[in-house]
C-alpha cells in the first residue's frame, strides 16, 4: 500500500526549514604579495588590517603586520620564508599574537612564538596571553622592598637587587655577564622564584651549553628558556624578549615571583634596526629608528613589584648590554641605563687581572635595592663601598709614591684582602649568612696578617668549620636577618678559634 503524501505536511516542513535557515558567510579579507625581500613582504589588498595583526601566507608561513602604508602593508615573516614570492595570496587571521603561559612551560625550551623546540613533546597548557601587554600603572605598583639574593658577594653586599627591580648587567664581550645572570638563576633554587632566560641572537651551541649548565645545577625545573638564535629571522629575535616577559607576567599576576634575564638587548636592538631599515623606516642616531628607546622601555616597564591588592607578586628583570671597548656612552647603553634602576658594570681589565666577578664597584649602582637589602648585610657591608673606592684611589697613588705612611699602607693591605674576599668562582652562589660571615671577617681584620693568596682557601675551609662547631651563627642570621651583639661576639670567637688552627701556605 502506497502512503499518501499530504500537501499541507510538505508545505509545513518547507516553511519550518525556511524559518530555521541561517545564511552563514565566512568573509575573509585577502591580499597579494607585491614584493618580498630579506624577511619582509609588501602586501596589497589588506585595507582593514590592524597594526600587529597576524596574517597567513598561502603556503602556511605566518607574518606580523608592522607597517601600515597608503596602499600596502609591511609584513615581517615569522619563520623561514624561502617559498614566498610575488603574487602569492595573504589572508588576515583577525587576531594579535598570543603565546602560551603557565606552569607547564617550566623546564622547557621554546622559540619566540612559544612553540617547544626541545623535543619533549607539546606543551600542555590552555592559557595564552597577548605578547603586547600594557605595563602596570603607578597605582598598581608597590615600592621594591624584598631582597632578591643573587648569591654573589659583590652584588648582594654592594649593589643589592630587590624583587621587582630592573638591574642592568653591562660590559664588554667575555667579561662574565651571562655567568652573573646564570648565578642569579641558580641561586633561586628553593626560593619559589620562577626564572626565564631569553637568548637573543646567540649561537645555538652557546644556548645548548647554558641549558646544560642549568640542568647540572637543578635549575631547569623552575626555569623557562626562550631562544631565538642568530640563525633565525630578525622578527623572531625582536619578539623573543616580549614572549619571555609575557610568560613572566603570568607568575607576577598570580601572586608569585619571577626573574627574567634578557641576553642581550644589544642584539635585540640590532635585530629591530635591521627590520626597520628593510621596512624603510627613517633611521636616526647610529642608524637605529627613532622608537628604539620605546621598544626597550615598554619591555622593561613590564617588570614590577605589584601592589597588595593585585597579589603582591613581582617580576625582576636583569637585562644584559654588550659594550664596545668599555664605551657606556653609546646610544643603546645610555638608553637602557636611563630606563633601569641601576647597573652592574663589568670590566675587561679586572677580569683579566683575576678579579672575578669583574665588577667595577665605583661605576656599579643599585638605585632602589638598598631598601630591599637585609639588615645583617647592611651592618657588615655599610662602609665597604667607600673602603674599596679609597683603596682604588690609594692604589693608583701608590704606583708613583715610593714611601707611604703607616695608615695608608694598612688601608692598602686591607683593601687588597677585601678584593680577595669578594672574589667568587662561577656557578657557586653563597647563602646570605655565609656572605655576612666572610665580609665581617675582612672588616674585623682577620686577614690583615695573612698573604692575600691564602684568603680564598681560608674562606673555603671556614664554612664547614662554622657549620660543624658554631651552627647557631648561621641560624641566628637566618632567623633574625641581623647581627646582634650575641652573634657579633660569637662570630669573633669562632673566627679566632678557626684562625688559630688554620695552616698558612
From Swiss-Prot:
EC number, as in UniProt:
7.1.2.2
Q: Which GO terms describe its cellular component?
A: plasma membrane; proton-transporting ATP synthase complex
What protein name does the entry list?
Answer: ATP synthase subunit alpha
What Pfam families would the database entry show? ATP-synt_ab, ATP-synt_ab_C, ATP-synt_ab_N
Q: What does this protein do?
A: Produces ATP from ADP in the presence of a proton gradient across the membrane. The alpha chain is a regulatory subunit.
How it assembles, according to the record, is: F-type ATPases have 2 components, CF(1) - the catalytic core - and CF(0) - the membrane proton channel. CF(1) has five subunits: alpha(3), beta(3), gamma(1), delta(1), epsilon(1). CF(0) has three main subunits: a(1), b(2) and c(9-12). The alpha and beta chains form an alternating ring which encloses part of the gamma chain. CF(1) is attached to CF(0) by a central stalk formed by the gamma and epsilon chains, while a peripheral stalk is formed by the delta and b chains.
Q: Where in the cell is it found?
A: Cell inner membrane
